[in-house]
Amino acid sequence: MTRYKAQISYDGSAFSGFQRQPNCRTVQEEIERTLKRLNSGNDVIIHGAGRTDVGVHAYGQVIHFDLPQARDVEKLRFGLDTQCPDDIDIVKVEQVSDDFHCRYDKHIKTYEFLVDIGRPKNPMMRNYATHYPYPVIIELMQEAIKDLVGTHDFTGFTASGTSVENKVRTIFDAKIQFEASKNLLIFTFTGNGFLYKQVRNMVGTLLKIGNGRMPISQIKTILQAKNRDLAGPTAAGNGLYLKEIIYEDEECFSNFRK
């Protein structure tokens, strides 16, 4: 068997998430269906580095899969790309070692979250940015977001009832930019891993700080108390993008560890 690694992007609007599940359209199911056609009708299982939720998008999701024989990687990419549905794009395919695992090999993820703060909202962005109709002071959020950087126990920012025992993660970079021409806030988080709904909960909390309904110090309070009830609401999934995944063997990996 030959193992392949692929970078994919997708519009999550019409998907019930990445991971295969019964009676739902998922990214995994669509790619596996296409690979089956390219593999003489034989099943191919793909593995994903991130299990994005319903409505969540990706520019830089990474998958891996095995095929019984070596293929020209560009022909394989082209075949997959042209036969997958229009809301999935196969960006790159490369052959990798048999022990490569897209989820368990050491890597760094970057997520982006888009928030439309226009009043009225932009209907063209309804599937691609979460609308926040209340006034915000961007400088308050930019100050508060600094407290998320570093190694912390993020229990207070994960979904209640999660089965993951170790909730310590490291965020290397966290920032907020404002694209005035589109009334868009762009939240960017880079870290060694993220808990279930962590990014959406951090954004929901920061928006509440920006609106003046929580103090700037609330991030520190939540991290210390490890209490989800102290955080803001979970922001909707339509604004979330898995932007990039960088593995340890890639040249730019060390830039984030400094």
UniProtKB/Swiss-Prot annotation:
Protein name: tRNA pseudouridine synthase A
Catalytic activity, reaction form: uridine(38/39/40) in tRNA = pseudouridine(38/39/40) in tRNA
Subunit structure: Homodimer.
Active-site residues annotated for this sequence: 53 (nucleophile)
PANTHER family: PSEUDOURIDYLATE SYNTHASE, TRNA PSEUDOURIDINE SYNTHASE-LIKE 1
Function as written in the Swiss-Prot or TrEMBL entry: Formation of pseudouridine at positions 38, 39 and 40 in the anticodon stem and loop of transfer RNAs.
Keywords attached to this entry: Isomerase, tRNA processing
HAMAP family cross-referenced by the UniProt entry: TruA
Source organism of this protein record: Streptococcus agalactiae serotype V (strain ATCC BAA-611 / 2603 V/R)
Chain ranges passing through the membrane: none
